[in-house]
UniProtKB/Swiss-Prot annotation:
Species classification: Bacteria, Pseudomonadati, Pseudomonadota, Alphaproteobacteria, Hyphomicrobiales
GO cellular component term of the entry, any: periplasmic space
SUPFAM superfamilies the UniProt entry points to: Cupredoxins (SSF49503)
Main location: periplasm
Domain Plastocyanin-like, chain residue ranges per copy: 30-118
Keyword annotations from UniProtKB, A to Z: Copper, Electron transport, Metal-binding, Periplasm, Signal, Transport
Cofactor note (record): Binds 1 copper ion per subunit.
Disulfide bonds: none
Residues annotated for Cu cation binding in this entry: H65, C103, H106, M111
The organism of origin for this protein: Methylorubrum extorquens (strain ATCC 14718 / DSM 1338 / JCM 2805 / NCIMB 9133 / AM1) (Methylobacterium extorquens)
CDD domains registered for this protein in UniProt: Pseudoazurin
UniProt-recorded name of the protein: Pseudoazurin
Length: 148
């Protein structure tokens, strides 16, 4: 009987611990490609949805790419991101909202991506109002349409 009580107590403790620990954050891989879904010079995927605390591992599958925050396309207080060309980088997202990223060497060719963190879209209209060249805007418009 004493062993049974000890097992019940241990099981109860294990359940209590499991339900109070935070869920592990996810890490999503995003490839930076010379050619892929959507054409030449693309992020794959170009639209990523995350929970606060999740991360993206940006992979320069084809060399010559980096990731940089597009000015005006991040929530207030979010860290500015600028990675080294050709280097992998992991970026953690704690602030909810919409983020726009570019590959600086290929921005004029429309190499952009959107990241949506959490449920808040407070900066969506501000992000949509940022001016881009025609090719970049052509790539962003369908991405924005998916997060309305």
């Amino acid at each position: 009987m004493m062993i049974f009580r000890a097992l019940i107590a241990a099981a109860t403790l294990a359940i209590a611990i499991a339900t109070t620990l935070p869920a592990a954050a996810d890490e999503v891989a995003v490839k930076m490609l010379n050619s892929g879904p959507g054409g030449m010079m693309v992020f794959d995927p170009a639209l990523v949805r995350l929970k606060p605390g999740d991360s993206i591992k940006f992979l320069p599958t084809d060399k010559g790419h980096n990731v940089e925050t597009i000015k005006g396309m991040a929530p207030d207080g979010a860290d500015y991101v600028k990675t080294t060309v050709g280097q992998e980088a992991v970026v953690k997202f704690d602030k909810e909202g919409v983020y726009g990223f570019k590959c600086a060497p290929h921005y004029m060719m429309g190499m952009v991506a959107l990241v949506v963190v959490g449920d808040k879209r407070d900066n969506l209209e501000a992000a949509k109002s940022v001016q881009h060249n025609k090719l970049t805007q052509k790539r962003l418009d369908p991405l924005f349409a998916q997060i309305q």
